[in-house]
Amino acid sequence: MAVTLVTVVVYLAIFIPLLIVHETVPSAPENPTVYRGLNLTEAWLDLAELSNGYHPFNSRRNDEVRNWLLKRVEEILDSNGVKYQTGENLNAVPDLSKSSDSKAQDVDILSVSEEDFQGESADRGELGIRAEQPAAVIFNDLVSNYTSNALTSIGVSGRKLGISTYFEGNNIIVYIRGTEDEEEDWWKPLPPYTHRLHGKGGVMVNAHFDSVSTGYGATDDGMGVVTALQLVKYFTTPGNTPKRGVIVLLNNGEEDGLYGAKAFLSHPMATFVHAFLNLEGAGAGGRAMLFRSTDSEVTRAYAKAPHPLGTVVSADGFALGFIRSETDYVVFRAEGYRGLDVAFWEPRARYHTDQDDAKHTSRDSLWHMLSASVATMEYLTSHTKQFVGPRGDHATGKVKNGRGSNGVWFDLFGKTMAVFRLRTLFAWSLTILIASPLVLMLVSYLLARQDKYYLFAGAVKPEGHESEAVSLKGWRGAFRFPIVLIISGAITFGAAFLLRKFNPLIVYSSQYAVWSMSLSLFFCVFWFLMAGCNFVRPSALHRVYALLWMFALGWIVLVGATVFEDRYKVSGGYIFVFYQAAIFLAAFIGLCELFALPKKNLVVEAAHDEHEARDGFDAVPHSDAIISTGDAQEDSPEADRDDEPSETTPLVGGNGHQSTLGASFARGYRRVIPAPVDGADGADGADDETIAFGDEQKWSAKLPTWTWLLQFLLLGPFMIVVVGQVGLLIVGALVQTGSDGSPLLLPYLLVSLFSILVILPVTPFMHRITHHVPTFFFLIFIGTLIYNLVAFPFSSNNRFKAYFQQTVDLDSGINQVTLAGVEEYVREIIADIPSAADQNISCGSNDKIRQGLSYCSWNGIPPKVVNNVKEGVPPEKGYKDWMSSKVTRAKGLNKATFNISAVDTKACIIRFDDPFTAFEVHGAAKSDGKWDDVPESGSDQIKLWHRDWDREWIVDVEWPVSEGKKEGDEGRSGRVVCWWSDHNELGAIPALDEVQRFMPQWAAVTKLMDGLVEGSKAFIV
């Protein structure tokens, strides 16, 4: 009973807090201004304003949000009485006449004049010290642009072509001068300012203010934006001035390709950034989690947060490609910045949908990100000796921000965070791999020297006698642990495949039902097999055998983890390092227990002497023949004959075994009873004797009765915490990815794996747990199995996501509505849509867009994104005027010029049937060489993004000369496509309105591509 009580109490004491931490958010303080310079109420009101409409980059609402942000920044600076500058043009010097009475509408594009340079040193190579420098500068960046390419999606067969992109940015950048920054306007693009170190470098906080076209952007990324605004307020509050300068980047264009962050890199302020904090939202509400970090040094900054959350396992998932989505973090890391990626991560069912609004998040969630950001930025801005100096990778053309070291980190109950270097973990791994087996071998050697190594001991002949050998039964229980573990694990993983086959998305809304089923199944199967083995053949060595098998298996796993640490810099193996260390200590104690046993030769001699003393006893002598005080039945020949099972032994019954099952559930490992000693143990001078537990080997009577508790405390509490919270985080992040096209089996396999790892610490003691616990778990298993097989996987709180797009052929007027997702549920949604009634719904795959989904299409209601026809006139009549495209071929050359203009959109794309090798957008800035415009394999698409409405694109395109052809012999064909993404006005996209109105409550719609509506015209040149 003691084993049962202790294990139940320990598991409950750990699991309940873990679930509370996982499911709840720490309460925000009652005082909204608990930090001087922060105002939670103000931030919440800002979030409400920011998220009151869809505001993708290609929408009018996006412009309104941007203007509001400019005004809001100036209001914050005004309220703090801060002197600041404003400016737009990257080639301009900010006007110093602007002070705290500036207004957003007064921001003008400034030009360079002699007055702007008053107070500067005549020699621009020297530091020009001004008497009064503005504390902040607002850059209204309407100049920076970006040109590059990306390879087509993974899974497309054949050569991977590129998707080239030209993007015009309109970011908002706020610079807050630090006390150790230079006092001049060093960002001016005049030599030598842009090519040298400016002070000790600055720290950037980044958030994007655009949303997707189907989400209000409260969490993605409104929370990050209002947090950034509060950081502007905090660091410009008197008394909070940072040592190192702070750059607040509010970028625009993240959702469609991380374009805002990429455009920022061409701004002069980009050379000042040494460290960064990226704020994101990949869920909707909950806690903000540390997704990943560039090194251990910056991670220590986040560890200062009041409620840190995260594990390096998530960073490994990104690094190894298991997590396919990306954030602005990858842009800054590639530039050489050192920093952190902090994001909300669940529930993913609300991500990019109309439930990403203020109603479905909370002030508590906002405070969790805000308080963590303040603590992180305080650390990064005050530690001025870090993030400065030669780079560890010796890369040229990147900021000189010092040497970072790969890190390992994980939180404990959301209260504190452990951070250390990967090299430290690697050293621990090697030490455990090398030292632990040597120590166990040394202990085994010492036991053998003292003739107390009972493991694997068989029959032993008494010394100096010719009588038959005495069986010590040391092999009993030697192989039961791996066999039972394999069977239990196989059945548990088999249940995962069962759910994948019959109800593959039940984990989407009922992950705890899946967890409960998996945990209870593994526990019940393992207990039943192990308790059965103990009932049939009880062994005092069961526990030490189990620990040694765990040690051997863990050692093999640790070898793999160590290889990944060394070669691939994967840090998530810390789980197995800690696990193996705990198993080693428990196994070490298990071996040391054997020192308490009598020597084997004394046991054999005693058994032989007792055999000689018993006249008429004709059974083969063995160690259990030692006389010990107990029931007369145990001393009888009949009891002795029953001790050895045979083919005639009853499965349940017999004098010896009738008491075994009951004894197995006693309150301790063995009972202490004073008794006179006859035989072997008397030679050791013992006055009292203990009898063996149940029908275990009689020589085991002197084994300690308390060491199991020490072993369990080493194996259990800490490892249950570490494994449990990693399992909850990783599984929680993946359970709702099935509707995105991710593998449906993966969440179930992970639940099975972590269920085994969580139960594993108690497995060496499992046979001592009373039948009440497995009976309870068996009932849970039956109930959850039935539920998981028959329950509907979605609900109004956990909605299935379908991906929407409408395509229009502007030449013919034909339009097609597409819903993508898991086909079974997409067809169920379409069945309720009136315009799709009586149509033949065709479904298929399209790996070029997104793998793992089915794309179902029908003829839909015509869109009205361009209001160019009178009321009552079919929209098709105006399609041809939505976009105009003209293609001019250069005579005798493989070159053409595209003139493209479109109404009410800032985004178009040219799709080619065959690849091209070069392109140039008229008016674009010259490439800085960071990226290739076109990859070596060529591109077949050019994405074009303007910052202004109704502007014409002029694009020159060149393509290669094929073998056997001359230049000018070949042309190109394809389609010119433009996107419309503004869904704020009801009736602009009637097909989407219809889907949202008639789809079931358990479903939601989100965007499929960059545009909700895609209009196209064919070209041949």
Q: Could you describe each region identified by the protein language model?
A:
Residues 348-516:
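Non-cytosolic juxtamembrane linkers/loops
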